[in-house]
Amino acid sequence: MGALPRLRAGRPHELGRAGERAAAGLLRERGYEVVGAGFLARRGELDLVCRRGDTLFIVEVKTRSGDAFGTPLEAVGPRKRLAMRAAAAEYRALSEWRGPIRFAVVGLTLTAEGGFDAELTEDPFD
């Protein structure tokens, strides 16, 4: 997934930013084009906006230092899902995009070596 600086647990902001960079790299490796990051909407932020083929993906990135509080995917609950859908609608209204929009979650868990174990889930809410 590319070289990242060795990370330690206990620095959530740094860990989250590194996770978003790692997620963008993973998505590029899997054929997605990252077209936006950090879109601020009234109901929250879209971590990554990607395109693959004729589909736009709204990607939530969840980075964890361990699994003591559940998996990264489990952290995307009903409230976050509603916020993502509302932010996606706002993004569509402000952009020229008229094609299909789908959702994805990239879950990253910090490893003992300072890298990440990564999991990409498309359509996690279906």
Labelled PLM ranges:
Residues 27, 46-72, 76, 84:
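Conserved catalytic cores of phosphodiester-cleaving nucleases, focusing on short active-site segments
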Residues 1-37:
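Acidic-basic catalytic patches of nuclease active cores, encompassing PD-(D/E)XK
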Residues 34-36, 58, 103:
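Hydrophobic residues on conserved beta-strands that form the core of alpha/beta folds
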Residues 42-44:
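Short acidic/glycine-enriched loop/turn segments that link adjacent beta-strands
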Residues 94-126:
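Domain-level recognition of nuclease-like catalytic cores that cleave nucleotide substrates
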Residues 38, 62, 104-106:
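Solvent-exposed beta-strand sheet faces enriched in polar/charged residues
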Residues 75-94:
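Short, charged, amphipathic alpha-helix that recurs within catalytic cores of restriction-modification
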